[in-house]
Amino acid sequence: MNELKIVFMGSPEFALTPLKMLLAEGYDICGVYTQPDRPAGRGRELCPPPVKTLALEHGLAVYQPQSLKKPEEQAFLKELKPDVIVVAAYGLILPQAVLDIPVYGVLNIHPSLLPRYRGATPVAATLLGGDEWAGVSLMKLEAGLDTGPVYSRSMVAIRPEDTTPILADKLAFIGGCMLLELLSQIPSLPEPKVQDNTQASYFGMVTKEMGLINWQTSAVEIERRVRAFFPWPGVFTTFNQKTLKILEAKPRNLGLGLKPSEVRVYEQSRVMVGSASGELEIIRLQLEGKAGCSAADFVRGQRNFDGVNLGV
């Protein structure tokens, strides 16, 4: 058992890998903070965050405060006497009183190359931006939104098939490795480097409305949204007054002369849709009330698809 006492704060799948890596290294996780259970699914039953499930499987103490701004919550956290707090997509703001508790500060795994893409959804922002590289920044948390000084950064090339969950998994592993390397240097931590705020950009929460396709944008932009907003909120349009989700797509430049939103069944089984620039080839899609399927299967079941305009 490593004698360093760690409080871990995280909620979604992204936080699972760093927590697993800390456990595998034998660190003393004296408490796990995660968001409260939320209603989910059609039945709106309360569902625990993924981190809570993992923590309980390992017999760890789990805490789910609505906020850490209350003095009593801060006093309780202080009683845990953490040497360091590790944050990975926790989702709650940490006030200065909390940041001051651990001996070696609060370390945050942020999945972007800070100061680029500060905010709540940096992985989706990276894909939307069309960047060639994604990355992780291991930073010392301060009161500002992802403004703290950075201990280290690591980069990974973005592949054409990367969606938000695929890329997030890669970055979570990289971030976990970076975290273990930094923790091994305690008590002699290096001096983190201040961010260049003039280069900062922000991206907030993703909303359902962001998934609605604007066919007046380019095929390249729409395809980026398909990958960035998978699996939620998804990217969608309408067909025959029903929601049509685009699950997988590729931008093309075939010179078909299609107007934005106009569908062309190409080579009998391929589906092309016009945009402001280029065609969007739909690879997989899902009509409201149906299972997802390939474009070829969809065309076989929708004989009137060729020539329609989507979203009208």
Curated annotation (Swiss-Prot):
The keyword Protein biosynthesis applies. One of its GO terms (cellular component) is cytosol. One of its GO terms (molecular function) is methionyl-tRNA formyltransferase activity. Attaches a formyl group to the free amino group of methionyl-tRNA(fMet). The formyl group appears to play a dual role in the initiator identity of N-formylmethionyl-tRNA by promoting its recognition by IF2 and preventing the misappropriation of this tRNA by the elongation apparatus. NCBIfam families: fmt. It is an enzyme of class 2 (transferase). Keywords: Protein biosynthesis, Transferase. Its EC number is 2.1.2.9. InterPro entries: Fmt (IPR005794), Formyl_trans_C (IPR005793), Formyl_transf_N (IPR002376), Formyl_transf_N_sf (IPR036477), Formyl_transferase-like_C_sf (IPR011034), Met-tRNA-FMT_C (IPR044135), Met-tRNA-FMT_N (IPR041711). It holds the Pfam family Formyl_trans_C. (6S)-5,6,7,8-tetrahydrofolate binds at residues 112-115. It catalyses: L-methionyl-tRNA(fMet) + (6R)-10-formyltetrahydrofolate = N-formyl-L-methionyl-tRNA(fMet) + (6S)-5,6,7,8-tetrahydrofolate + H(+). It comes from Dehalococcoides mccartyi (strain CBDB1). Belongs to the Fmt family. The gene is fmt. This is Methionyl-tRNA formyltransferase.
